[in-house]
Amino acid sequence: MVLISVLASLLVLQLSYAQKSSELVIGGAECNINEHRSLVLLYNSSRLFGGGTLINKEWVLSAAHCDGENMKIYLGLHHFRLPNKDRQIRVAKEKYFCRDRKSIVDKDIMLIKLNKPVNNSTHIAPLSLPSSPPSVGSDCRIMGWGTITSPNDTYPKVPHCANINILEHSLCERAYNDLSASSRTLCAGIEKGGIDTCKGDSGGPLICNGQIQGIVSWGDEVCGKPNKPGVYTKVFDYTDWIRNIIAGNTAATCPQ
């Protein structure tokens, strides 16, 4: 495993208000080693692409803008310097998208088929797809290896977790001019600020009621600002597409 000091020195950060492709949890704390069994890390020797979520033994869900060349997929990872015996590494066999990967305002989703199945273990297990969409006010969990400070970056050696809520979508519409009411996204965070996903967390999960309800997508350039919640891909709207792709119907149509 590459040492965190080396990894941090090689990160290529692409900062814009509409991208969290290298972001971490602001206002959180170290995740319990047993609570992020589905969390994966996407990176190569020179760049942190973001996170993702294992949804079955062969498939990972992430954000489209986290895609990159020579990307490796790490599972069962907690401490960069102390990889545990359960750690497994995979690469993408196939990738599926719902839109032009250059834009992340909407349809920011990537479905990855692994080159070989993973083995479930103490620190590796899939997360369920949503059976229904989350309601406003729902308590949710965010997690990732992104920066824990903003605007200056501080990358941790372990993933951080925090609790946030599903907010009215109109709050994000007011905060971001590019976001439309019809976008297939969720608005989530803490209205007063202080807790947020940030650079390095993109592609990671928004977990509500034990299911992956959102994918970390984008937000303000400075993470954790009041009235500037995060925007998350709404996974429920893509469940039919995801299941069709997994079943072998690779021509499945994305929701419009």
UniProtKB/Swiss-Prot annotation:
Keywords: Blood coagulation cascade activating toxin, Disulfide bond, Glycoprotein, Hemostasis impairing toxin, Hydrolase, Platelet aggregation activating toxin, Protease, Secreted, Serine protease, Signal, Toxin, Zymogen. Its platelets aggregating activity is inhibited by chlorpromazine, theophylline mepacrine. Its platelet aggregating activity and its amidolytic activity are inhibited by PMSF, TPCK, TLCK and soybean trypsin inhibitors. Is unaffected by hirudin or by antithrombin-III in the presence of heparin. Coiled coil: none annotated. Disulfide bonds join C31-C161, C98-C254, C140-C208, C172-C187, C198-C223. CDD domains: Tryp_SPc. GO terms for molecular function: serine-type endopeptidase activity; toxin activity. Expressed by the venom gland. Transmembrane segments: none annotated. Residues 19-24 form a propeptide. GO terms for cellular component: extracellular region; secretory granule. SUPFAM superfamilies: Trypsin-like serine proteases. The active site is at H65, D108, S202. Glycans are attached at N44, N119, N120, N152. Residues 25-247 form the Peptidase S1 domain. It is found in: Secreted. Residues 1-18 form the signal peptide. GO terms for biological process: proteolysis. Its EC number is 3.4.21.-. Belongs to the peptidase S1 family. Snake venom subfamily. Thrombin-like snake venom serine protease which potently induces platelet aggregation and has fibrinogenolytic activities. Clots purified fibrinogen and hydrolyzes alpha-chains (FGA). High concentrations of this enzyme also cleave prothrombin (F2) and factor X (F10). Is also able to activate factor XIII (F8). Monomer. This is Thrombin-like enzyme cerastocytin. It comes from Cerastes cerastes (Horned desert viper). The lineage of its organism: Eukaryota, Metazoa, Chordata, Craniata, Vertebrata.
